[in-house]
A protein has these predicted regions:
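Membrane-interface helix starts
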Residues: 9-25
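Transmembrane helix boundary and interhelical loop/hinge segments in multi-pass membrane proteins
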Residues: 13-15, 303-312
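Alpha-helical transmembrane segments
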Residues: 28-58
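Peri-transmembrane interface segments
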Residues: 36, 233, 238-293, 303-305
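A structural signal for hydrophobic secondary-structure junctions
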Residues: 61, 71-208, 212-222
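Structural beta->alpha junctions
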Residues: 66-67, 73, 196-198, 229-238, ...
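Transmembrane alpha-helical interface segments in multi-pass membrane proteins
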Residues: 301, 310-345
């Protein structure tokens, strides 16, 4: 019967053209908007993970209470041992220590007097021992001038802050901050390159420094602000599962320096942002399909009037009502399948 109905639809375009056109257009627009919003959500998660949240994040209980301030004086200690233990317990997760700090970037003249000065946000990442951070942060693609650091004492600065302070490649700059214990810290660094990520928060005043230099600068030997964990591919359910197991083992609410693992979705405003995107996608699909259903319903009513005579003839020659009804349903299914294939291709 399907073959017979398919031939009929192909030969009589008036029965199939407009329904297929309407359904194909609706499917195409629904898939297009859903794919765009899904892609935006994936990119949001990707950008958040690589710059700040990781897929999971380990911090101290006290740090978590003030996490928006990034208080590295409440950070993790004995980080190398912790990462070794984590790698054994969660071999599928790649662990990276990070140090976030703020300070003043000072450009001195030949006499050591200040030429220009501005606030910067420092990122202490592992630049030398492996290439994971290079790939994660896309440093080679983000590089706009100069080269990546090849030795200790070299740093990357955002192109915007470089232009603002009139800093050139190979200039020696001074970063002024405070150590983990609250005393003043100053150290000189050589600008090896300039970067532009296309992310406003980073481009406004980011400084990328190797974590070993930051540890020496801030008196944070074998310490880190946070430890970020990255799965091979982001899996929200798995991040919650890993966090639950870790927190049941290591987290003590009464100990301010006990470690707590936080999945990406529950960090900052991510829960609200992701939930809002999901609700927008669901609402759009529901509303659009509902409107398309009304249009098709109206089209079906008009078609019913048109084929009224045809149905009467079929009944008159002895065709059963059930057979006619089933053939109309099969015809609708064929139109829906054809339109869906056209709309998604």
């Amino acid at each position: 019967m399907f073959k017979f109905l398919a031939k009929g639809l192909l030969r009589d375009r008036t029965r199939s053209f407009f329904p297929i056109l309407i359904i194909a257009s609706g499917v195409m627009l629904t898939v297009l908007v859903y794919s765009w919003m899904s892609g935006f959500s994936v990119m949001l998660i990707y950008e958040s993970a690589r710059f700040g949240t990781g897929h999971v994040k380990i911090v101290t209980n006290a740090y978590n209470e003030l996490i928006d301030q990034k208080p590295y004086d409440l950070g993790l200690m004995n980080v190398d041992d912790k990462i070794e233990t984590l790698s054994q317990e969660y071999p599928d997760v790649h662990w990276q220590p990070r140090i976030y700090f703020g300070g003043l970037l000072d450009l001195p003249d030949e006499k050591g007097e200040t030429l220009s000065q501005g606030e910067v946000i420092g990122f202490g990442v592992d630049l030398f021992t492996d290439s994971f951070e290079h790939d994660l942060l896309n440093l080679e693609e983000a590089l706009t001038a100069g080269s990546l650091p090849t030795k200790n004492g070299e740093i990357l600065i955002s192109q915007e802050i470089a232009e603002k302070l009139d800093i050139n490649i190979h200039d020696v700059v001074t970063i002024i901050g405070s150590t983990m214990y609250g005393s003043m810290a100053m150290d000189n660094f050589t600008v090896s390159g300039m970067i532009l990520f296309g992310v406003q928060a980073m481009d406004r005043g980011a400084v990328i420094v190797d974590i070993s230099d930051v540890r020496s600068f801030l008196d944070m030997e074998d310490s880190a602000s946070e430890i970020l964990g990255f799965l091979p591919t982001y899996n929200e359910a798995k991040t919650f599962e890993i966090s639950k197991v870790f927190n049941e083992t290591y987290f003590d609410e009464d100990d301010e320096f006990s470690e707590i693992m936080i999945p990406l979705r529950t960090q900052g405003q991510m829960e609200y942002i992701i939930a809002t995107l999901e609700s927008y996608m669901a609402s759009f699909i529901f509303v659009f399909i509902f409107i398309m259903s009304l249009v098709l319903w109206n089209s079906g009513l008009m078609k019913g009037i048109r084929v009224y005579g045809e149905v009467g003839v079929r009944l008159a020659i002895g065709e059963s009502k059930g057979h006619i009804y089933r053939s109309l349903i099969y015809e609708s299914i064929l139109i829906g399948i054809a339109a869906t294939i056209i709309g998604t291709s």
